[in-house]
């Protein structure tokens, strides 16, 4: 059992469980293809969740930076913090577009072997980066359990670890890109 950000994960092991032929998913030795297809659709949903979290964490941070005063002016008036938030909103908007494209491709029956892992990689990295920046802008209160930003930060890490990790997603994207290159040369 592993718990990160209040999302408990369990492992279930089946041994010698009879399954009728009519109840089986896929063909004998063909389960990985079915599993992979389902996982690709699932990681698009996780990417959407990550982008929603990044967007909300950014909204909370922007509001905080407008109201929190330091040296008689709002935190958002400081150039360095404004640049952090500008970078964050750029990445959030770009990530949202990538996730929308992946979802559209999946819904349209188009190939998602590259788009789905790209969407999850980018969305989870964006979520993690936005929440790390948000904690910096919030200062000490951003790490306390009484304030929601810490939950967004923990959830970002949990989503990054869920389903396939960054390394495997990078391998999927690389394989898809290399396959495209080979097909273009043929």
Where are the regions that the model predicts?
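Glycine-rich phosphate/cofactor-binding loops in nucleotide/flavin-utilizing enzymes
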Residues: 141-186
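FAD-binding core of flavoproteins
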Residues: 1-59, 63, 73, 167, ...
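C-terminal helix-coil-helix/basic helical segment that borders enzyme active sites and/or dimer interfaces
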Residues: 62, 66-73, 89-122, 135-138, ...
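A glycine-biased, small/acidic residue-tolerant capping/turn segment at secondary-structure junctions
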Residues: 104, 127-153
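Residue-level signature of the cytosolic catalytic core of signaling kinases
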Residues: 27-28, 77, 108, 145, ...
């Amino acid at each position: 059992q592993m718990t990160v950000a209040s999302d408990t994960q369990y492992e279930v092991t089946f041994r010698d469980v009879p399954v009728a032929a009519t109840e089986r998913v896929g063909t004998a030795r063909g389960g990985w293809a079915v599993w992979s297809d389902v996982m690709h659709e699932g990681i698009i949903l996780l990417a959407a969740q990550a982008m929603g979290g990044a967007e909300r964490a950014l909204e909370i941070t922007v509001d905080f930076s407008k109201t929190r005063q330091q040296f008689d002016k709002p935190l958002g008036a400081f150039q360095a913090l404004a640049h952090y938030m500008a970078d964050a909103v750029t990445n959030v908007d770009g990530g949202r577009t990538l996730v929308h494209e992946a979802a559209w491709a999946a819904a349209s029956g188009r190939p998602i072997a590259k788009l789905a892992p790209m969407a999850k990689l980018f969305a989870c990295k964006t979520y993690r980066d936005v929440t790390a920046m948000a904690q910096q802008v919030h200062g000490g209160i951003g790490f306390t359990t009484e304030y929601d930003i810490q939950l967004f930060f923990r959830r970002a890490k949990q989503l990054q670890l869920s389903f396939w990790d960054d390394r495997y997603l990078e391998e999927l994207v690389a394989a898809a890109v290399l396959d495209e290159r080979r097909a273009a040369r043929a």
